[in-house]
Amino acid sequence: RDIKQFQSRRFMGSYTDLMRDPTVRPATQFFLDELYSPGDYSARDAQFARIAGTLQTVFPRPVVHTALTLALLHAKTEELDHAMAQAWLAQPETTPEAGRYAVAWKTAGQPEARRQQLAWVMELGHDLTRFTRTPGLRLLLRTMRRPAQAAGMGALQHFLEMGFDTFGALTKKRGAVEGFLDTVRERETRLMDLLFDAELVACETQLARTLGQAR
């Protein structure tokens, strides 16, 4: 739980400028709520795993692919968070949280998994953008509410509708989606490179600065 809360605050600190920009604030908030939130998504992930084989009976194929990508992302995130939590708890409670997180990150390692995690985040953003440009898909999503609820896929339905509306609004401004996704990719990649390659004191200093911006 501490790891998730730290990561949520870190995301807010990394994107305070985007949260102040009315054009991209909804998309930034959507990423925070759905992908970087400290909330427990185990029920939604279990739902996806349980009904993965029946998704195609309710949703169009492109949507099925996105749902499975989301499930893979959250499963990998849980795995990495668990590894970091073990390393976090192994440290004295008096350790400053920024330094504690940096040590946990370096201890957990798995750079390839981290890169894949970010690649899935980007893929979801591009998928949702593509959906908004598919004629009739928004209406189709709306008509699928009851079937989705009946099939136990209400959480997925919510994610898709929220994502569709959020990115649909963003596509109305030329280049806004691409700019938003590029910014997230660049900042998250820069942070990963820092945490994997830099000395501990540099990692702790940057993380503490970022957390300060979230306040």
Feature locations, PLM:
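Extended, well-ordered protein cores
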Residues: 1-214
